[in-house]
Design a protein with these regions (language model features):
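N-terminal helix-turn-helix DNA-binding core of bacterial DNA-binding proteins
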Residues: 3-5, 11-36, 55
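Alpha-helical residues within the helix-turn-helix
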Residues: 32, 49-50
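Key DNA-contact positions within bacterial/archaeal DNA-binding proteins
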Residues: 39
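Beta-hairpin "wing" of winged helix-turn-helix
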Residues: 52-67
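Charged, amphipathic alpha-helical coiled-coil/dimerization segments
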Residues: 63-80
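C-terminal regulatory/oligomerization modules of transcriptional regulators
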Residues: 74-75, 93-142
Length: 142
């Protein structure tokens, strides 16, 4: 299973902002520190804001900061928010499934259990546990 760049960027934003101890961080700062397009990050931050994970403040002195305690944000919840679907194989999508093996396929159920276990493990990882000081890499601010 591979996560999209969108999810990767969302996790990076949350980790970077979470490491700033409530300081407002500009999207430009995050973009520069991670080598990511500011325009793309703007979309990511907007989505995180709509989900109540970050607070955005407009204006000259504006920026982004966490809207919740990082201990209450799980990697699993972020992945579910930002990934378009978890359709690993065609038969996971009933509307598009044309596989003739589907009615008797055991693999479909095994893959479904594996996906569930993957997400369950990600639900055990809080944002707080991956921030600097919790074993994470040091992140610098401007």
């Amino acid at each position: 299973m591979r996560l999209t760049d969108y999810t990767d960027y969302a996790l990076r934003v949350l980790m970077y902002v979470g490491a700033q101890a409530g300081r407002l961080v500009t999207i430009q700062e995050i973009a520069i520190n991670h080598g990511i397009s500011k325009n793309h990050l703007t979309k990511v931050v907007h989505r995180l804001g709509l989900a109540g994970l970050v607070q955005t403040v407009r204006g000259r002195s504006g920026g982004v900061r966490l809207a919740r305690d990082p201990a209450t944000i799980t990697v699993g919840s972020v992945v579910r928010l930002t990934e378009p679907d978890f359709i690993m194989v065609e038969c996971f999508d009933e509307a598009r499934n044309t596989c003739s093996l589907s009615p008797v396929c055991v693999l479909k159920h095994a893959l479904g259990r594996a996906t569930g276990a993957y997400l369950q493990e990600l639900d055990r990882i809080s944002l707080a546990s991956v921030l600097p000081g919790a074993g994470g890499a040091r992140m610098t601010g401007a």
